[in-house]
Amino acid sequence: MISYSRDPKEEIPASAVKILGLGGAGSNMLERIALDSIDGAQLISLNTDIRTLSASLSKSKIQLGLNLTKGLGTGGDPELGQQAILEAEAEVRAALKDQKIIFLCVGLGGGTGSGAAPILARIAREEGAFVIVFATMPFLFEGSRRREQAETALNQLAVLSNALVTFDNNRMGELVLAKQGIHEAFGAADKMISESIKAVIRLVVKPGLIHVGLDELITALRTTRSRCLFGSGIADGKDRAAKALRNALSSPLLDQGALLKDAQSVLVHLSGGESLTLFEIELLMQNLQKHVPEHTQILFGAAIDASMGDDLSITLISSLPEEALAS
C-alpha cells in the first residue's frame, strides 16, 4: 500500500535543525558535512579535547568537561565522558532549545562518544527535538573493550533516540576500491553519512510536490529499540530512475537491500529537477515494490528542486526491531 499527502503541512525552517558532531569521530563527520555545505542547518562541535575542538570548521563549539579533563581527552573512559557532558549540561541545553530536528554524529567505542552520546540524545529529546543518531562502530582490531563500550552505548541510544542509523567500520571496504587507502575509506564513510543527513533535510525541510512531513518520518521509524535502515541514491542520464534506485539499494546501511525484506513500512522520497516525469516515478516505485514484502506500507513523497538539474535522487528510510537485525 502506498500512502501520500499533498496537504500543505507546517514547514520546518532550516534554522530549527542542528547537526552535532560529538568526539573525535563525530568531528570528522562534521567536517565532511561542513564541506558539503548543507544550507541553513547549524553545525555544533562538542568535545573534551580542546585541540580537536579548535580545529573544527563548525562555527559553534562546546567544550565538554572544562574543569574535569582540562582540555584533554577522556582516555577511552566512558564514565569521564558522562561526567564531562553533565558538567556542560546547561550550555548544551541552551544550544538545543526550540530545535525541531537534531542530528547527532558520533563514533562509538571511545570515552567521549560512548559516554556522552546517550546523555546528549536524552537532553535533546527532553528539549523537544526529534533526534536522529548516526553512529559508527569500531573495527574489530581495536579490541574487545572498545567494542563492548560501543555496544553498551548503542543499546542506550536505541532507546533514547527517535532514529538510530549505524555503520560498522568493518564494512568500510565495501565503500572503496581494494587498492585505495584508509584515508579514502574514512572519507567515503563520512561522505555517505553527510549524504544521508542532506537527504533527510531535503525530505522534511523543503516543501514538496507530494509532501513528506515529520509525522510520516516518525511513522516509518516508530518501532522502539530499533535500528534505522537508510539508503540514498542519485543518478542522471538515460534510465536515471533505475540507476538511482540501484544506488540506494546498494548502500551498506541497507545490506545491499536485503534488510528491506523484513520492513513493515518504508518511507520513500524522490527529488528531481523540472524534467522529473510521472512515468519515471511510476517505474521507480514498481521496481521498489519488488524489494519489499507485499504487506509493507510505503509512505511516498516527491519534490521538484530546480537546482538538481538533470539529477534524480531517491531516499529510502525504514526501521527494524533489533531482534530482526540479529537474526
Please tell me what each predicted stretch does.
Residues 1-327:
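Tubulin/FtsZ superfamily GTPase core signature
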